[in-house]
Swiss-Prot record:
This is Ribosome maturation factor RimP. InterPro entries: Ribosome_maturation_RimP, RimP_C, RimP_C_sf, RimP_N, RimP_N_sf. One of its GO terms (cellular component) is cytosol. Belongs to the RimP family. Keywords: Cytoplasm, Ribosome biogenesis. PANTHER family: RIBOSOME MATURATION FACTOR RIMP (PTHR33867:SF1). GO terms for biological process: ribosomal small subunit assembly; translation.
Amino acid sequence: MKQEIIEKVKEMLQPLLEERGLKLVDIEYVTEGKPVLRIYIYNPEGTTIEDCEWISRRIGALLDIEDLIPVSYTLEVSSPGLERKLKNVEEYDIFKGRDIKIVLKEPVDKKNVIKGVLKGREDNNIIVEEEGEEVRIPLENIARANLEFKH
């Protein structure tokens, strides 16, 4: 049931996101206690409170019309955060061009941590530019990856 709701919300969000030039990062539907539907969106030019409000108003109205969640719930729409932990492969495409920190399972060039600019993904590799050099990291060698915020 939870996954069905998430999939239906994704479908409903797609035209709204495209209209506003936004990308969907993640959807969480938590049912412990009062249910919470969390939608994380990303604007490559910088996610604003206006982006979140715009999506919240529109998806909230659509959800009310569809009566997709038949109980009282809380809707939260937000940016993914400055130092978000990347949870799925698609996020490496979404956050291309952002600073990233990757903790490795096995060292690459004697390093356990790679920090640099995310260049994207190719096949089963993540490409990071670290100190002017391109580093290819196999997905299976990534223990953890987070966006990095540089002050």
